[in-house]
Amino acid sequence: MRRKVLAGNWKMYKTRGEARAFLEAFVPLISPGAENREVILCGPFTCLDLLSAQAGPYAVGAQNVHWADHGAYTGEIAPQMLVELGVHYVIVGHSERREYFNETDSTVNRRLNNAQDHDLVPILCVGETESVRKDGITEAHIRSQLDRDLELVDMRRLIIAYEPIWAIGTGKTCEANEANRVCAMIRKHVNFEGVPILYGGSVKPENIDELMAQSDIDGVLVGGASLEAKSFARIVNFEV
């Protein structure tokens, strides 16, 4: 059985003090029944050591990693630096990185491979824009992303997140059955039954139970709703 993964992406939010306060409120809210679920907190670089140092029912993830181990890459971070901070997971290819920082499928692939070379588990993000969706080519677009992003990547040490870009931070939510259909298509295309496939896009307490009841959705990648302890705890404690 594939494990359930609940990942919070804090993006560029939370100072160290705010992260500490979040943990104090969040950890006691996790129900004992959630122990078979993998909870991941992907904080900003400045909070990663703090998240690792605190005892809690969660793993630590980063939001970016470079394709090189060292070099003149101002502002970037190498995988071994993340490992030293107690990081186990890293988001790669998020739509915001692709849009604002010009990441391409080629650089995403290089980041994925280097992360795995250092025993990090990447969370690969793929998804379509509103225009791609309206043109009816969502599946073709995502298959193309997967083919280019996953070259030489070890599927046994990978998580894939489907994030319809039109639903990120917009309040629009992809219908659960449609999200499940796309996740099933992704699983079939990568031809590896064991890879966890998450849904990301305006996930909130109000829709988590319906999303997690879907057969091909193994978890969620949560943005805004992961910033508040009570909200994210309800997501982690989903009921199906």
Swiss-Prot record:
Catalytic activity: D-glyceraldehyde 3-phosphate = dihydroxyacetone phosphate
Annotated positions binding substrate: N9, W10, K11, G169, S202, G223, G224
Assembly and interaction partners: Homodimer.
Keywords: Cytoplasm, Gluconeogenesis, Glycolysis, Isomerase
Function: Involved in the gluconeogenesis. Catalyzes stereospecifically the conversion of dihydroxyacetone phosphate (DHAP) to D-glyceraldehyde-3-phosphate (G3P).
The name this protein goes by in its record: Triosephosphate isomerase
InterPro entries: Aldolase_TIM, TIM_sf, TrioseP_Isoase_bac/euk, Triosephosphate_isomerase, Triosephosphate_isomerase_AS
Enzyme Commission (EC) number: 5.3.1.1
Protein family (similarity comment): Belongs to the triosephosphate isomerase family.
Taxonomic superkingdom: Bacteria
Keyword hit for Amino-acid biosynthesis: no
Active-site residue numbers: H94, E163
Parts of the chain that traverse the membrane: none
Subcellular location: Cytoplasm
GO cellular component, one term: cytosol
GO molecular function terms attached to this record: triose-phosphate isomerase activity
Gene Ontology BP annotations: gluconeogenesis; glyceraldehyde-3-phosphate biosynthetic process; glycerol catabolic process; glycolytic process
Keyword hit for Cytoplasm: yes
Top-level class of the enzyme under EC nomenclature: isomerase
